[in-house]
Structure formats: C-alpha cells, structure tokens
Amino acid sequence: MKHIEKLPEPDFFINWKENFRHSNGREPTYKDFMGTDEWHNLRNILLNEQGFICCYCMKSVGDWDEDANDWDSHIEHFIPRNIGNIQPHSYRAQNVQLNYDNLFISCNGERCCKDHCGHYKKSEDSPMILSPTNPDVEEAFKYNPLDGEIIGTSAEAMTSARVLNLNTLELKRHRRTAIYYSELFDEDFEEKREQLIEFYSSRNEAGAYIPFCMAIVSVMKEWAV
C-alpha cells in the first residue's frame, strides 16, 4: 500500500455542498453528488492526488474499460458511506459520505469480478483496517519477490490484507512481474540500489506512480546481493 497525503479539500466541492444545503434544506448524500460535473472533477482530483494507482493494491487506475463500459475504478469511501445504517451510533458514522478525507480511488478488482480492494471490502469497517493516509502504512507490509505475496507485519496490516483480499492469484502475479522487471536481479543492482529506490518512489512527468511501486521499493530496500 502507498501512503497517500490528502490535499486541502477543493473549493468547488465545498461550494457544491454549501449550495445544495441552501437549495434543499438538508445535508447532501453521495447519491445526490454522484454523476454531477463536480463529481467528475473530484474523481480527477483524487486520481492525481494518488498518482493514478489504486489506494489499496497499487494497480494502475484511471482508464475507461471498454469491455465493462465503465471506468476501471471508483470513488471509494474508506469508512463505508452506509455505515450510518449499520452502526448508527458509531462516532465513525458521522459525516463520512462527502467527507473529503474519507474519499479515495480504488480499482474495481480484476476484469469481470470484484475480487479485491474497495468492492470486495464493501461495508466492512474496523479501526484495524489501515488507512492509506496512515504515515506508517508503507512499512506495514512486506512482499515476497518470488511469488508476489503481500505479508502484513502487524495485526492491523494482516487484517487489512484479509479484508481487501490483497493476495489473490492475479495480484500476486502482478506484483511478482513488477518486481521481476524492476532491475532487482541485475548484476549491478547494488550500485544502483539507492537510485532505483528513488525512481520507484517518485512520480513520472505525468504525475503517476509506477504500478505496485511500494512492493518494488520494499523488496529493493531489503534485498541482499
């Protein structure tokens, strides 16, 4: 998982919510917001904020899926937007539907099946699930370079990997492939280690991270030549 540093809430989002309250006399819901011009703008803001990778598994996101006739990703509520129906008295149920700090972009899982990340997590909520905004989230997971397995280093990390189903065969294959082609196994890797870690930790000119970047970085930091 890649740490996400949330930017200030966009003015257009604040204004939309204020205008809705003034016009309708109630708090807006996510259903009210979905599909508006501001919703599309916010989606682009979140994609840029995350560097065009899934907030959970780090797959590339932001493209239109022709087969599904839909985007390859969705706006994700880290604390589920329907938690008020499930845990109405929980402090976590307060103002989550349109709380900017609770909004991310998650992939839709693999094509044809929502088998990991946001859609798999659904309405499950627990303080044991690590948020992408947690400053220590990158160190909470290790990766096996041989099979691509993600390994939680704490109870919270293990819970997160389970709830998000981050060890599907496809995700393990994606991570293993990304690590394999990362120059980790080059003869001169040790000479380039720090340079490569910096490269995979950084965005490209388009503002995007390389898919599965932190899996690569984590393995590179620990790899013994």
Regions found by a protein language model. Give the residues of each.
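C-terminal, charged low-complexity interaction regions
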Residues: 151-225
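Long, low-complexity, intrinsically disordered segments enriched in glycines and aromatic residues
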Residues: 114-169
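Histidine-centered nuclease catalytic patch
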Residues: 59-119
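Extracellular structured ligand-interaction cores
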Residues: 51, 70, 100-104, 136-140, ...
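Short Gly/Pro-enriched turn/cap motifs at secondary-structure boundaries
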Residues: 44-45, 94-97, 131
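A boundary/linker detector
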Residues: 1-40, 217-225
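An N-terminal domain-cap segment
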Residues: 17-59, 63-70
